[in-house]
Amino acid sequence: GGTALGESVRSLLQHDDAGQGMSPEAELLLFAASRAQHVRELIAPAIAQGQIVLCDRFLDSTTVYQGVARAIDSKKVETINQFAIGDTKPDLTILIDLSPEIGLARVHARSDGQLDRMEKEAIEFFQAVRQGYLDLAKSEPKRFLVLDGSQSVEELETQIWQKVEATFT
């Protein structure tokens, strides 16, 4: 998302009937295309102006969802990520960790039965995603802040702001 192209790709990936049966490789390349546009259209210009940029998801999502959970070779994912984002890399990544079972229960509670293509994946997929994120966080501990997602929103907010202020002020 974030750009007109990104929103179109997002719709295709999540809701469009044409996205059903999509190969892992096509999914990877579509996410990379969306991310490349997002970097060039929004992120890079903002950084060039000295702004702080917040993203809901970024290259780690591709590394984990397509590389780990979809079992695409990590070197290929890394190469495609590098091509898509260039030198743009987060200074801080906040990972709110939650068991897939609780996370999916929350998704179901808010969705009225209208799940997107990713949300319909089996629990094993989300277990692989979670482990992939935790492994990534372990490999880059200076960049990642891992928080227990079972805490209250207020507790999470306090911890996040403390880390953001320490990192960017």
For each of these PLM feature ranges, what is it?
Residues 1, 34, 58, 98-99, ...:
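Short beta->alpha linker loops
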Residues 1-85:
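ATP-dependent small-molecule kinase phosphotransfer cores
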Residues 5, 28-30, 95-98, 104, ...:
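Generic leucine side-chain signal with a strong bias for well-ordered alpha-helical environments
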Residues 45, 54, 80, 89, ...:
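Residues within well-formed alpha-helices
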Residues 50-51, 90, 141-144:
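A generic structural signal for alpha->beta connector loops
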Residues 54, 92-94, 145-147:
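Hydrophobic/aromatic beta-strand patches that form the interior of the parallel beta-sheet core
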Residues 61-131:
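A glycine- and Lys/Arg-enriched "phosphate-lid" helix/loop adjacent to the NTP-binding pocket
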Residues 101-169:
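NTP-dependent small-molecule kinase module
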